[in-house]
Amino acid sequence: MSLALRSELVVDKTKRKKRRELSEEQKQEIKDAFELFDTDKDEAIDYHELKVAMRALGFDVKKADVLKILKDYDREATGKITFEDFNEVVTDWILERDPHEEILKAFKLFDDDDSGKISLRNLRRVARELGENMSDEELRAMIEEFDKDGDGEINQEEFIAIMTGDI
């Protein structure tokens, strides 16, 4: 095996290992979602609880997805899965997400009028939805800080730069 190929494999293995770990915050979100939607507190979640928990974590799950998860992980045929199984499924799904695609989805949540830009109005709506009581002056300052082309709005390229720390 050539030295170049060997070092490429080492780099690839390192990248893969790095990518295969959740942050502590992500781990806590998974635990919180399970506990929140385990409505009967029996330490297992059924079809409906699983579907809602997955959606709360940002997954657009279809009925077939939820049924497959239950089929694959419900070893005792109870119609439920445990936290350990839920954690395994959700961890895999989170690690398979494309970060760039997730950033574009987030941009679309702000850009509800499909203008291709985040305006003061868009930012005000999101702040209000998140329970943030911010003045227009504060919101304008946020836009100005990241508005590299000076048009008074945040375009997709500027948003990606914000989210990836390239600003």
Swiss-Prot record:
Q: What is this protein called?
A: Centrin-3
List the subcellular locations: Cytoplasm, Cytoskeleton, Microtubule organizing center, Centrosome; Nucleus, Nucleolus; Nucleus envelope; Nucleus, Nuclear pore complex
Question: Pfam family of this protein, just one?
Answer: EF-hand_7
GO MF annotations, alphabetized:
calcium ion binding; G-protein beta/gamma-subunit complex binding; microtubule binding
Where are residues bearing Phosphoserine located in the sequence?
135
Q: What is its main location?
A: cytoplasm
- Gene Ontology BP annotations: cell division; centrosome cycle; microtubule cytoskeleton organization; mRNA transport; protein transport
